[in-house]
């Protein structure tokens, strides 16, 4: 479960239980609980992983056995079950009733609503107001929020957006009255929990004296790929009972009285989906005052929380929770094509109940974006992962080993664990080569560029030619919006940021761009590749193919130079994300193959090894380096993140300064810590709860095994007062609490001697 989505759903459930009292409008909230069944230990381990996240969000749950399941669902067979996870506060509501209650509450607070209105076009005025044209006249407004369900793609195109939202057909069956349920209800028994048979991919719940069965079957097609038919409203689609047959049989085996029940209704309707199944909630990229709340495959479950946190974002400038998991800007243009959406949305639908493994890489719509050396990496037995549409090597399988992740909670240690350890060892002891072409890259130039960037980031810009700094764009509350490595390159600045943040960071840069033309912003991500050569022998290797002086005096740490490597003119930055002597080589993309081949040819002499994202992750945790999107989010301030060294509070002006000054005076509510964990076969990954003396005091944001130091590590936020070095804590991993200790940052090379070598 995504942390963002979990927070949104939690707020919705809480809201719906109080909405009727607040508005006087009945919402038909049935607090029945939610029961997820498990037929094997693998499924139970998935639930344990989920429970860790649920704890950090505040969602109550119980892990129960077959006897407790039978009490909650007396009509279910339980003899083949291992157990279940039970959410007592969950249930179901009537979407129409919730909608009416929200409307009533909005009207009571001054909102105006209009029905039977068709939007025909939208246009923005020079003063940023929007004119929304309808079949009943124009509406001029400051802000537009697009919540158009199955019409999302058409709505987006009205304002020049290609939204990766397309409906998928979803069917469910409603039975007629079932004698046993009639008798059960007459006896005054409570309504049974919503039943989810994950291993057979369906949900079931009571509907008066009958049952509803909702399968998530394979082969469910996308609908209206080329546009919703004109005039389509609440109409239903032709049912396909044959697709549901395996699920109907499975439901009858689990609940025998369903097998003999008569079908009252068979309904097939479209549900809006995105490629990852999460909604798109937040600002639309490239537009001012235009917001999205689209792709809600969870339906009414997300309405309350999405509305709340979107309102915060619009009114206060930032949501109070981490919304990266639902931010519309998480998708690239390559992930918004017709073919990509069709393949991924259908895959996402049929995987709703499939076990969600750690490090899972699904196969649909791949490859979408590749660096020019993709074929060479494939020939080297690279095991690829996809992020933001990019194919990136996660690890390189040894000869004779299939380059694919094998998934199992039971095995705990993965099939790539040893290989990644060898990649780390090679980088730490010799030299490694990493492809980070997916990095987001921008050029910022013009007479106003320096002033513009200085007001955006909390750090100072580099003052010397070739100087490089880490700079953070903050929210008004001091949370981290974006992270950039910024280099002064001649008469311009070169900014590098996360590969998954291209659309997000371009939008962040664009929103504060002066309108007087004094600053030019250019996204050069696709024009330039990035290869990283790092390790103690990286200087020796590169010196074989460049005439540049790579010595400490000639090319100090945290600087950059325009140099020629293997005949390729490029920008070299003496920085990296693994904590070793090394250089990022930012080069013209059309010369990547030439550069790569030369490095590989020369590298043989120095024991060069290709390494992937998993090895990089291990090494960056050994350095306590924060990752944007997991360790650095809007939810925690940059001071809470322990990055005060990148904040210059004496600067005249930057976004978030006032909030940080106040927090510095009052103290931070959370502290960022590095943890060493006592584990044997499973590591933290992020979102695990952290305890002290039985009380939950924080959550992990990243975790993995540190191969260089032979320790399991995690990065985490804990309540202030729990972060002193040596503090003994516990962290829950797959349902087991493991001992953890707060250790000093950067357990590998704490004095940065390797970086400065």
Predicted regions mapped to residue ranges:
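Flavin (FAD/FMN) cofactor-binding and adjacent substrate-gating region
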Residues: 15-18, 22, 30, 39-109, ...
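Flavin-dependent oxidoreductases
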Residues: 121-237, 246-254, 339-361, 365-370, ...
């Amino acid at each position: 479960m995504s942390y963002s989505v979990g927070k949104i759903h939690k707020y919705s459930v809480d809201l719906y239980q109080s909405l009727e009292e607040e508005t006087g409008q009945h919402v038909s909230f049935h607090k029945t609980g939610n029961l997820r069944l498990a037929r094997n230990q693998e499924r139970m381990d998935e639930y344990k992983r989920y429970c860790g996240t649920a704890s950090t969000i505040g969602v109550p749950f119980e892990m129960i056995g077959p006897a407790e399941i039978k009490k909650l669902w007396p009509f279910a067979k339980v003899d083949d079950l291992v157990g279940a996870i039970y959410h007592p506060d969950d249930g179901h509501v009537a979407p129409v009733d919730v909608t009416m209650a929200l409307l009533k509450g909005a009207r009571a607070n001054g909102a105006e609503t209009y029905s039977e209105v068709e939007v025909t076009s939208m246009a923005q005025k020079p003063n940023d107001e929007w004119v929304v044209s309808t079949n009943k006249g124009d509406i001029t407004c400051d802000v537009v929020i697009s919540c158009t369900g199955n019409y999302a793609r058409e709505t987006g195109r009205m304002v020049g957006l290609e939204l990766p939202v397309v409906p998928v057909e979803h069917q469910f069956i409603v039975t007629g009255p079932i004698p046993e349920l009639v008798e059960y209800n007459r006896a005054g028994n409570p309504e049974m929990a919503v039943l989810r048979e994950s291993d057979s991919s369906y949900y079931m719940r009571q509907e008066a004296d009958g049952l509803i069965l909702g399968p998530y079957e394979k082969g469910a097609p996308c609908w209206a790929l080329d546009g919703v038919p004109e005039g389509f409203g609440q109409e239903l689609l032709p049912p396909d009972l044959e697709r549901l047959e395996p699920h109907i049989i499975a439901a009858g085996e689990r609940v025998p009285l369903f097998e003999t029940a008569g079908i009252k209704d068979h309904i097939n309707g479209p549900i809006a989906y995105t490629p990852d199944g999460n909604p798109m909630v937040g600002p639309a990229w490239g537009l001012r005052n235009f917001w999205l709340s689209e792709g809600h495959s969870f339906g009414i479950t997300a309405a309350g929380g999405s509305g709340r946190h979107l309102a915060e974002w619009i009114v206060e400038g930032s949501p109070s929770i981490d919304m990266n998991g639902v931010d519309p800007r998480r998708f690239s243009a390559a992930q918004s094509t017709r073919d990509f959406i069709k393949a991924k949305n259908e895959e996402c639908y049929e995987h709703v109940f499939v076990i969600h493994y750690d490090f899972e890489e699904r196969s649909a719509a791949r490859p979408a974006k590749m660096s020019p050396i993709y074929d060479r990496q494939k020939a080297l037995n690279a095991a690829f992962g996809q992020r933001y549409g990019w194919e990136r090597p996660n690890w390189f399988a040894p000869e004779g080993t299939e380059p694919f992740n094998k998934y199992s909670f039971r095995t705990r240690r993965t099939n790539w664990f040893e290989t990644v350890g060898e990649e780390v060892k090679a980088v730490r002891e010799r030299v490694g080569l990493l492809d980070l072409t997916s990095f987001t890259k921008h050029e910022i130039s013009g007479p106003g560029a320096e002033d513009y960037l200085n007001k955006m980031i909390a750090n100072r810009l580099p003052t010397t030619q070739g100087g490089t700094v880490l700079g953070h764009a903050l929210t008004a509350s001091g949370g981290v919006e974006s992270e950039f490595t910024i280099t002064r390159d001649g008469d311009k600045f070169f900014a590098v940021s996360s590969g998954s943040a291209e659309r997000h960071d371009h939008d962040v840069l664009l929103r504060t761009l002066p309108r007087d033309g004094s600053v030019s912003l250019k996204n050069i991500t696709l024009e330039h590749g990035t290869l990283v050569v790092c390790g103690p022998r990286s200087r020796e290797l590169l010196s074989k193919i460049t005439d540049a002086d790579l010595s400490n005096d000639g090319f100090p740490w945290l600087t950059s130079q325009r140099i020629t490597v293997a005949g390729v003119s490029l920008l070299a930055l003496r920085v990296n994300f693994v904590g070793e002597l090394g250089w990022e080589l930012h080069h013209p993309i059309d010369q990547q193959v030439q550069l790569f081949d030369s490095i590989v040819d020369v590298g043989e002499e120095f024991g060069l090894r290709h390494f992937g994202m998993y090895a990089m992750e291990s090494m960056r945790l050994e350095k306590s380096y924060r990752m944007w999107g997991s360790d650095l989010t809007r939810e925690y301030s940059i001071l809470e993140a322990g990055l005060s060294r990148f904040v210059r509070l004496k600067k005249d002006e930057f976004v978030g300064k006032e909030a940080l000054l106040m927090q510095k005076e009052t103290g931070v509510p959370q502290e960022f810590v590095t943890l060493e964990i006592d584990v044997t076969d499973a590591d933290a990954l992020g979102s695990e709860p952290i305890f002290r003396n039985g009380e939950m005091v924080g959550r992990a944001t990243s975790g993995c095994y540190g191969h260089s130091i032979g320790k399991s590590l995690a990065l985490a936020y804990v309540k202030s007062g729990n972060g002193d070095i040596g503090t003994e804590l516990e962290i829950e991993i797959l349902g087991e609490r493991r001992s953890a200790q707060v250790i000093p940052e950067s357990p590998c090379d704490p004095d940065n001697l390797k970086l400065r070598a």
